[in-house]
A protein has these predicted regions:
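Positively charged n-region of N-terminal signal peptides that target proteins for export
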Residues: 1-4
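Bacterial N-terminal signal peptides
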Residues: 7-14
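Accessory carbohydrate-recognition regions in carbohydrate-active enzymes
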Residues: 20-186
Length: 186
């Protein structure tokens, strides 16, 4: 009897996992990411995050987001200024949007992109950075952001780390007062 009960439980868990995977294919992470007719956007972002995770890894389409694109991403824009690790979704107030990485091979701090070469699904984001031909892929675990950059052959691989990147420094007077980096292995 115990074996039968355990078998039924294991089978049920397997079905639940399969159903969850099938359902996520209907999710469109771009819903609520763009302003309509000059109004405010839904303040959502298409990037990677895990349920109850500490990291919300997504592109920044503004150097200093404000009310109109408080999540750091606006679908109507076509420039990426980096990939931030924390952000709020749907709040209408820009906050977090810090610890930004930007892949480059020439020191550029931004790159054009098109939505034709941008993909998102729950837990995953990918975009081709047009200016230098760098493919960026992002995913997360509960406590980590994972980046994978593919650079064109023969180009230098550089990453700009901006620990002073924060939402709308101008109008709200925010500034980072202390930041540090510790390299454990190189």
């Amino acid at each position: 009897m115990k074996k039968l009960l355990l078998s039924v439980c294991a089978f049920s868990l397997t079905l639940a996992t399969l159903q969850a995977g099938e359902i996520t294919k209907y999710v469109n992470p771009f819903i609520g990411t763009g302003a309509i007719d000059g109004g405010l956007s839904g303040n959502n972002y298409p990037g990677a995050t895990s349920p109850f995770g500490m990291i919300q890894l997504s592109p920044d389409t503004s150097e200093a987001p404000n009310w109109g694109d408080a999540s750091g991403y606006d679908y109507n824009r076509n420039t990426i200024f980096g990939f931030s690790h924390t952000r709020l979704s749907g709040t209408g107030a820009s906050d977090l949007i810090d610890i930004t990485l930007m892949p480059t091979s020439s020191g550029r701090t931004s790159s054009a992109f098109t939505h034709d070469e941008e993909k998102a699904r729950p837990g995953y984001y990918q975009v081709m950075l047009k200016d230098e031909g760098i493919n960026a892929e992002l995913t997360t675990t509960q406590r980590n952001g994972i980046h994978r950059y593919q650079y064109p052959a023969g180009k230098d691989a550089e990453i700009i780390l901006d620990m002073d990147h924060s939402a709308d420094k101008g109008s709200w007077g925010r500034r980072i007062i202390n930041s540090q980096i510790r390299i454990l292995n190189d």
